[in-house]
Regions:
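A generic structural signal for well-ordered coil/turn residues at beta-strand boundaries
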Residues: 147, 184-186, 224
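Eukaryote-biased recognition of electropositive, low-complexity segments
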Residues: 165-220
């Protein structure tokens, strides 16, 4: 049965730049950081009992009760920043790095439907937000030793919980941006818990990261989750990279 839920998706910056042998370690660190941030935000039990979670390799998509939304807006971003900063020296010693983009949204989702749990417009939209150029830019143009995460919040969530006064954050702590990804064209709000800036993004002198081509998408384009294709306007990973239905699903 459909119900309004809070949606969280995180994605690691330059995940594919790591060696293949290190990818599992980095993904485990993503899980550890998110779990720690939830626990320190008063969402520990909520996270342990989450009914729908997709492990995407370079990130996580989770659907949580709507009641978790205020804590996901604050203090979760600050707690995630702290968890990633604490892990950085240990990862750096192994030649690894981890910074996360994150998107928050709310909407109608059926997270229990056996044949296609979690598939909805809200799920697609939160991943469009994650792929927003302003979100990528604000993280890439920050100091990698200072800023470990950047968030984008949907306009719906912002209006209800930030402008509506249901969190301790003020509207002035967010930056309004326009997100244009495929047919998605809506306003959203950036929030960086520990902002910083650099004159030139790291590795900019080497040019943009070259990504290996992924498998061809289904005829006519679309999003594939758990082997179920949602019609779209091009090959798009609902989670962060091009996939073909091979995501690992966890349901409790």
């Amino acid at each position: 049965m459909e119900a309004f839920r809070a949606l969280l998706v995180v994605d690691a910056e330059r995940f594919s730049a790591h060696r293949d042998v290190d990818l599992r370690t980095v993904h485990d660190e993503i899980r550890r950081a998110v779990k720690t941030a939830c626990r320190k935000s008063g969402l520990g039990e909520t996270w342990e009992n989450v009914r729908f979670m997709e492990s995407t390799g370079d990130g996580i998509l989770a659907i949580l009760p709507l009641e978790a939304a205020p804590a996901l807006i604050d203090p979760f971003p600050r707690r995630l920043q702290n968890a990633l900063a604490a892990a950085a020296p240990r990862l750096r010693a192994r030649g690894l790095h981890l910074r996360l983009r994150a998107a928050l949204h709310m909407g109608l989702v059926d997270d229990e439907r056996p044949e296609a749990p979690g598939i909805s417009t809200a799920t697609i939209d939160v991943n469009r937000l994650l792929d927003a150029a302003p979100l990528r830019d604000v993280l890439s143009r920050s100091d990698p030793e200072v800023t470990f995460t950047a968030f984008i919040v949907s306009a719906d969530l912002f209006a209800a919980y930030v402008a509506g006064g249901r969190t301790r954050l003020r509207e002035s702590q967010f930056t309004r941006v326009q997100v244009r990804v495929k047919r998605f064209d809506r306003p959203a709000y950036l929030y960086v818990p520990t902002p910083s800036a650099v004159d030139e993004p790291p590795d900019a002198a080497d040019g943009p990261e070259v990504r290996r081509p992924g498998p061809a998408g289904p005829s006519g384009g679309g999003v594939t989750l758990n082997g179920v294709t949602i019609s779209g306007d091009g090959t798009q990973n609902a989670i962060g990279n091009i996939v073909g239905g091979d995501l690992r699903q966890e349901r409790r």
